[in-house]
Amino acid sequence: MPLSSRMPGLTCFEIFLAIAEAGSLGGAARELGLTQQAVSRRLASMEAQIGVRLAIRTTRGSQLTPAGIVVAEWAARLLEVADEIDAGLGSLRTEGRQRIRVVASQTIAEQLMPHWMLSLRAADMRRGGTVPEVILTATNSEHAIAAVRDGIADLGFIENPCPPTGLGSVVVARDELVVVVPPGHKWARRSRVVSARELAQTPLVTREPNSGIRDSLTAALRDTLGEDMQQAPPVLELSSAAAVRAAVLAGAGPAAMSRLAIADDLAFGRLLAVDIPALNLRRQLRAIWVGGRTPPAGAIRDLLSHITSRST
């Protein structure tokens, strides 16, 4: 029989469950990669549709009503079944496929994917299993998201500060941005610390717009200085970490780079890390796919299970 018009869609239940788990609209918004206003509107729409108050907004967050507690339990069960169905449909689509099209941001493609792929191959060979063929394309995070959405890639890896909406995702690794300069730079010689505001006002060597590293630095500066923070235009925009590194070594200016990409430079003193007090430059690296919270069954899920087991 058809569902009642009072029955919300799965997205509404997913947002409401995120509110219940986070305890606030803001926490749910951060978890889902939405604005707090969008989450608030969706909750109000859901309450109007079903005709029941689900949560009470307080100064300390969002408190579920008795009805909201019951609906949250139902939502968890419903989404668990939906994830199983979604994963099963994905299994039907990918059954027998031994080729995985992967698109990854450059830092992940260069610094992490080779190790993950080699260790997966070794593990599969030890078990006597079939080794899937991984076709890897390196790009920036924005293009990786678009490739997964458009079906060009089966799996993506990104560095963005927030998970993209409408895609499943899981954290697969953690990284840290490091502001670096060559040994002769003025920041390397002075005793006074560099502030977050001074960093924001300094022209930097950067990656191209919408790259994960550039977006992560901007997000960290806004968290520290406020949403109205003004950032100086870059002195150079380059399309690869290698080009950024070379420009910094040549004296073009400071840059924020992945610690994964410059570990040797820091160890041997070719580049020096600049401490920026109160600026949180730690970040999460994510895998993304089309579908729900559970990745598609088969080779894709096996690859992600292998990666996450190594990162824990």
From Swiss-Prot:
An annotated GO cellular component: cytosol
Keywords of the record: DNA-binding, Transcription, Transcription regulation
Domain HTH lysR-type: 8-65
One GO process term, biological-process aspect: regulation of DNA-templated transcription
Gene Ontology MF terms in the entry: DNA-binding transcription factor activity; transcription cis-regulatory region binding
Parts forming coiled coils: none
Highest taxon of source: Bacteria
DNA-binding residues (ranges): 25-45
Annotated family: Belongs to the LysR transcriptional regulatory family.
Name recorded for this polypeptide: Uncharacterized HTH-type transcriptional regulator Rv2282c
Organism: Mycobacterium tuberculosis (strain ATCC 25618 / H37Rv)
Origin organism lineage: Bacteria, Bacillati, Actinomycetota, Actinomycetes, Mycobacteriales
